[in-house]
Amino acid sequence: MAIIRVTVRTFQNLEHAELFLSIGASTKDGLNKASLDAKFTISQSTSQPNQVVSVWEYKDKDHMNEVRKFLSAQSRLPNSLAPKEIAYETKVIHSS
């Protein structure tokens, strides 16, 4: 059963959000090199530009854990950025 995970990160300022976005630019290549197939979208709020929304789709719980473990190991995000983070996890009921 597919899983959708939405994470809303609110950074202290626009520069921190843009740093996160620039680091995230290499995410797809890293996942491909690790042979991890995951669908994701990373977007920036137009009304609150220091806010970044990530939407990930995983095949199942094991796949989610594997991808998240890889991303955590690859993270170059300084702890000093420490965004406020809210995450939502759902199971997919209908999809097209």
Question: Where are the predicted features?
Answer:
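Short, surface-exposed ligand-recognition loops at beta-strand->loop->(often short) alpha-helix junctions
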Residues: T10-I23
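Short, low-order "capping/linker" segments at domain edges
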Residues: V92-S96
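Active-site-flanking beta-strand signature of metal-NTP-handling nucleotidyl enzymes
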Residues: I4-T10, V53
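An amphipathic, aromatic/His-enriched active-site/gating alpha helix that lines ligand/cofactor pockets
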Residues: A25-K39, S47, E57-K91
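A short, glycine/Asx- and small/polar-enriched loop/turn
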Residues: Q48-V52
